[in-house]
């Protein structure tokens, strides 16, 4: 039972780290969206998305299989694209939007 608690504590710590890293990535996506908007570049760049997936697959040593890696990174990319679009379509804060959604 103690080992289960230890493992869960380690997982919780990793989850906290992942959340911080994902929010850091989202912040960079917001900045990228603003720059793309200034340069009149499209938010959606399928070749860049394919490049990210390919790079992550090449770095995958498991135990996650490639299908899991593709699914996870596709979701991360989708959310990054969403915050990029949001950053140029509104002056609202992403965090404010999330809090409003949670209160409903």
List each model region and its residues.
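Domain-level signature for soluble enzymes in the chorismate/prephenate branch of the shikimate pathway
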Residues: 1-104
């Amino acid at each position: 039972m103690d080992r289960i608690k230890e493992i869960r504590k380690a997982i919780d710590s990793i989850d906290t780290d992942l959340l911080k890293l994902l929010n850091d990535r989202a912040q960079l996506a917001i900045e990228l969206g603003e720059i793309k908007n200034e340069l009149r570049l499209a938010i959606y760049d399928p070749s860049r998305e394919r490049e990210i997936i390919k790079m992550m697959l090449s770095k995958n040593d498991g135990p996650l299989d490639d299908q899991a890696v593709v699914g996870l990174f596709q979701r991360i990319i989708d959310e990054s694209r969403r915050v990029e679009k949001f950053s140029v379509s509104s002056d609202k804060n992403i965090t404010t939007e999330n809090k409003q959604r949670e209160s409903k």
